[in-house]
Regions:
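Peripheral, non-catalytic segments flanking oxidoreductase cores
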Residues: 1-170
Length: 170
């Protein structure tokens, strides 16, 4: 399959954690997802780490543009949070957003196992969910939510509650 060949050509490995991957584990179970990770394409040395598919320059350009736009949104969002917490200007400069420490991940949650059957020998079985519950790492996650749902937020009084998908929102 040509899609599989394209994905395996940019698969991450022990020397580079960026690129395509379909075998992540959460609590010793394989996640039912495929991911593509990259860092700021404009960052010095990024070409040594980012793995882009050959012949898909439009994909790389689109991801660069998306990274730029979401980086600006992240900075603005963190500024709003900072202001809402009543922190002073000096404090804001100490926690300033840095694109150098940012990465982007594209997640795909397929209906079935993302690993072809002929490649599953010796792999840990799939977990019960697409990925571990409430496992986003980092300071902030910007989610371009689809119409499937699955996003939750924690309420002090009611525990985890579903956030209904809203078209066009992040």
């Amino acid at each position: 399959n040509s899609d599989r060949a394209l994905k395996t050509s940019i698969t991450r490995d022990a020397t580079n954690p960026l690129g395509y991957f379909d075998r992540e584990l959460t609590k010793r179970k394989r996640d039912n997802k495929e991911v593509f990770d990259f860092v700021d394409p404009s960052r010095e040395g990024a070409d040594e780490f980012n793995r882009w598919p050959d012949g898909l320059r439009d994909f790389r350009d689109a991801m660069t543009s998306l990274f730029d736009g979401l980086s600006m949104l992240t900075e603005r969002t963190l500024g709003v949070i900072h202001g809402a917490l009543g922190l002073g200007k000096d404090s804001r400069e100490q926690v300033a957003f840095s694109r150098l420490s940012s990465s982007m991940r594209l997640n795909h949650y397929p209906v079935g196992d993302p690993v072809p059957e002929n490649e599953r020998t010796g792999l840990v079985g799939l977990g019960e969910t697409a990925l571990g519950y409430h496992t986003d790492p980092g300071v902030i996650t910007l989610l371009l939510q689809d119409d499937v749902g699955g996003l939750q937020t924690e309420s002090r009084d009611h525990g985890w509650i579903d956030v209904p998908p809203q078209p066009g929102t992040i």
